[in-house]
């Protein structure tokens, strides 16, 4: 199995290092990751400037100022030959649950892999300690994919409780929950009296029902959420069509 491994925390982050070590026990792994923390970069792609890479002695490649999406795009289309069999993103330091997937560079890297036609996993740890647990879970899932390919055409968003492996209760297939809107902005004055602004923490849980990713992780289960790229609200198409007609918009052209 040939694996392209990326993340959004940066190439030196403990999560990607732990995962690379575990994956290399049974697979050929090429790390292509940002040279710095790019958390929250979502699906952004660098189009107005060129990208430089740096290759470490062990073969890992850092993309200077690159986003997670840049890294996967370059990895699949230029840097890993032959092309990978699967794209893995993570291990993220902290969860990507509910609405987090909209902003997450970890999920975006996996999404780019899927967009390029490859199976893709995004892996996040609900904390900052037991990376070995998330690595073991990821290895188990990848071995399963090698034995029995999953032909859903979906991204698997995996969130792992920050627990020792023996305390994990199992795996649940879940849906994304949701958070209250984040609205905290933290102002700060710099030494010259100019105001700086920091974006605050994510909102608290809003929908954490028993079938959500939030509930699974809180209860000690690995959450596996299938995600797809199509953002069309299919159930709303007829509603919007009727609204355009009743509002008289259709008759203007």
From Swiss-Prot:
GO cellular component, one term: cytoplasm
UniProt main location, coarse: cytoplasm
InterPro entries for the chain: SurE, SurE-like_Pase/nucleotidase, SurE-like_sf
Transmembrane residue ranges: none
Cofactor note: Binds 1 divalent metal cation per subunit.
Chain positions recorded as a divalent metal cation binding sites: 8-9, 39, 92
Enzyme Commission code: 3.1.3.5, 3.1.3.6, 3.6.1.11
Gene3D superfamilies: Survival protein SurE-like phosphatase/nucleotidase
Record keywords: Cytoplasm, Hydrolase, Metal-binding, Nucleotide-binding
Entry-linked SUPFAM superfamilies: SurE-like
Top-level taxon: Bacteria
GO MF entries: 3'-nucleotidase activity; 5'-nucleotidase activity; exopolyphosphatase activity; metal ion binding; nucleotide binding
Subcellular location as annotated: Cytoplasm
Cofactor(s) the protein requires to work: a divalent metal cation
EC class of the enzyme, as a word: hydrolase
Catalytic activity annotation: a ribonucleoside 5'-phosphate + H2O = a ribonucleoside + phosphate; a ribonucleoside 3'-phosphate + H2O = a ribonucleoside + phosphate; [phosphate](n) + H2O = [phosphate](n-1) + phosphate + H(+)
Functional summary from the UniProt entry: Nucleotidase with a broad substrate specificity as it can dephosphorylate various ribo- and deoxyribonucleoside 5'-monophosphates and ribonucleoside 3'-monophosphates with highest affinity to 3'-AMP. Also hydrolyzes polyphosphate (exopolyphosphatase activity) with the preference for short-chain-length substrates (P20-25). Might be involved in the regulation of dNTP and NTP pools, and in the turnover of 3'-mononucleotides produced by numerous intracellular RNases (T1, T2, and F) during the degradation of various RNAs.
Similarity comment text for this entry: Belongs to the SurE nucleotidase family.
Alphabetical list of HAMAP family matching this protein: SurE
PANTHER family, sorted: 5'-NUCLEOTIDASE SURE (PTHR30457), 5'_3'-NUCLEOTIDASE SURE (PTHR30457:SF12)
Protein name: 5'/3'-nucleotidase SurE
Organism of this sequence: Cronobacter sakazakii (strain ATCC BAA-894)
